[in-house]
Amino acid sequence: MKKLLALLIALMTVLLCSCSSGGETIRFGAAGTGGIYNEAANSIKSIADADGTLKIETKTTAGSAANVRLLSQNYLDAAIVQSDIAHDAFNGENNFEKSGSLDGYSAVAGMFTEACHIVVKKDSDINSVDDLLGKTVSIGEEESGSELNAKQILSAYGLNSKMVK
C-alpha cells in the first residue's frame, strides 16, 4: 500500500508540475491535520520542493466536500477529493442538492479506495446501525467526506444526524 501511495504521489507531482508555468504557487487542498489526505498533500509538496520547479502551498480544509467547493470557487488549484463526493457535487446530488451542481474541476488521478467503518466499544450494546438511535456518534468534520458518508449511511437506515447525539 505504501509503495502504491508513493507511486501515486509521484504521479500527481509530475502532473501538477506539467500544469505550472513556473513561478506560480499551486494552492493544494489537504483536509485536516494528521489525516491521510494531509500526509499525501505534504508528500506531494515535499517532492515538488525538492524538484524546485513548482511551489505548492498546502491548505488545511475540512475535507472532500470543502475541497470540491473551494476548487469550484477558484480558491484552490488542486485538492484531494473522494470520488463519490466529486461526483455528487458535479451532479448536484445527495448533499449537494441545495447548493446545486459545482463545476470548474476535473479528476486527475485516483489515489486509493476508501472504506467506511462503524466502530464501537467492545462492551457496547450497539450491534447494528439501528442501535445508534439516541447515542453519541462522531460523524466527521463539517464539509468532510466522512460527514457526508456518515449522513448517507444514517439516512439509509432511516436515521439522521439529529437522531444521534
What are these regions (language model features)?
Residues 52-56:
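A generic structural motif
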Residues 23-50, 114-165:
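Bilobed "Venus flytrap"/periplasmic-binding protein-like clamshell domains
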Residues 1-9:
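Positively charged n-region of N-terminal signal peptides that target proteins for export
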Residues 34, 58-69, 160-165:
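Short helix-initiation/N-cap motifs at beta->coil->alpha
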Residues 97-111, 116:
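A structural signal for short loop-to-beta-strand junctions that line the ligand-binding cleft
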Residues 62-64, 74-75, 80-94, 143:
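Beta->alpha turn/N-cap motifs
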Residues 15-18:
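C-terminal motif of bacterial Sec signal peptides marking the signal peptidase cleavage site
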Residues 42, 65-76, 152:
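Short helices/loops that flank or line small-molecule/ion binding pockets
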